Regions:
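Extended, low-hydrophobicity, polar/charged segments
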Residues: 1-163
Length: 163
């Protein structure tokens, strides 16, 4: 089963409605945004982060136009050092290549060892956009349905106030 089909099947199983736009591969948030210009939904970026010892992993979802203050984030999650996780860690934990990170990759995290965080600024938005485990599609999903999806696959999440 391809990566998108797995996402589609799970959302349909949960009775979650969503829209999908197919487009050429998007390797940056700017490219992805250009393919869905004019459509409703907050443009997100999903960052897969880890501590220095690679003993803890984090998935942070925030507005794609907002820069991340890594020092503030590490304080809020009570970690000493945080950095972007490697492509190898991403493949190991979510079976995804770089450029396709999203909450849907958590379908592949059987260990349930990734902490999920959302920036408060986006959770009030009705619709969020993500790559559904492929950078050749963008999915539009209601925020509350995304939270329901996460809970259905065994993930809780926290909402942070990022500067």
């Amino acid at each position: 089963m391809d990566a998108y089909q797995q996402v589609k099947d799970k959302l349909e199983e949960l009775g979650i409605e969503f829209d999908v736009v197919e487009h050429p591969p998007a390797f940056t948030t700017e490219q992805a945004d250009s393919y869905i210009e004019g459509l409703e939904g907050v443009r997100t970026k999903s960052m897969f982060l880890t501590n220095k010892k690679k003993t803890q992993y984090y998935l942070l979802i925030m507005d794609d136009q907002k820069p991340l203050d890594m020092d503030d984030f590490k304080e809020q999650v009570e970690a000493n050092r945080i950095r972007m996780a490697s492509a190898d860690s991403l493949a190991e934990k979510m079976q995804l290549p770089p450029g396709t990170v999203s909450p849907f990759g958590l379908l592949n995290n059987e260990e349930k060892d990734i902490r999920v965080y959302f920036d408060k600024d986006i959770v009030s938005e009705e619709i969020m956009t993500f790559h559904p485990n492929t950078n050749e599609k963008t999915i539009f999903i209601k925020t509350q349905d995304l939270f329901r999806f996460l809970e259905s696959i065994g993930f809780s999440y926290q909402i942070l106030t990022l500067p």
